[in-house]
Amino acid sequence: MKKKLIAFVCFLLVSLSGLPQLPVRLNERPVVLNTSTGALKGKMVTPNQESGYPVVLIIPGSGLTDMDGNSAALPGKNNSLRYLAEGLAGKGIASLRYDKRGIASSASAGKDEYSMRFEDGIKDARGWIDYLSKDKRISGIYVLGHSEGALVGMAASVDNPKVKGYISVAGAGRPAYEIIEEQLSLIHISEP
C-alpha cells in the first residue's frame, strides 16, 4: 500500500510539472521625475513582495524609442522592454523604465531638438538613480541600457556609489559618430 501511495504521488508530481505556470501578479505604478524642463514619466514594476528586492533602471535606446522598447519610426510594437520588466518581476526583481525627454508620455519635458544634448540623458538617468535610492524597499540599484541607452547608463553609473551594477544590452562597440552616420544613411527621405 505504501509503495502504491508513493507511486501515485510521484505520478501526480510529474503530471503537474507539465502544466503551465500561473502568471505572476505584477504591481505596476506610474512614476514621475521632475526636471528643469518638465516631468519625465515612467513605470515601476515591483515583485509581489514587501521589500528587500533589487531594482533595474531600464534605459531605452536611441531615437523615438519609448519606455516599452517601441520606436515610432518602426512599424508595429515589440514591447521588448515591457516584457523584460515583467520577466524581472517574475524573478523577484523590480524595474523602472521611463520615456526619455521629448518622447511619448515625457514629450512635454523635451527641449527643441537642436538644444538637446547627450548629457541631458545622463542627467536624467542620474535623476532616476537618485529617485530609486530614496525607496527603502530596494536592496540595490542596477542600471541596464539598450543601444544608446547603454552609453547613457554607463556614463550615469561610473563612480556612482548608489549603483551596484551595470548591464549593457547591444551597446555600441565602435565610435558614436560611425553609428550615427550609418543610421542616417539608412533613413530614406522622400523629396516632395
Residue ranges and their predicted role:
Residues 21-51:
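N-terminal cap/lid segment of alpha/beta-hydrolase-fold proteins
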Residues 50-51, 56-87:
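Short, surface-exposed "cap/lid" segments of acyl-processing enzymes
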Residues 79-107:
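Conserved alpha/beta-hydrolase
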Residues 114-134:
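Alpha/beta-hydrolase active-site loop
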Residues 131-183:
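Primarily recognizes the serine-hydrolase "nucleophile elbow" in alpha/beta-hydrolase
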Residues 185-192:
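Residue-level detector of conserved catalytic or cofactor/ligand-binding positions
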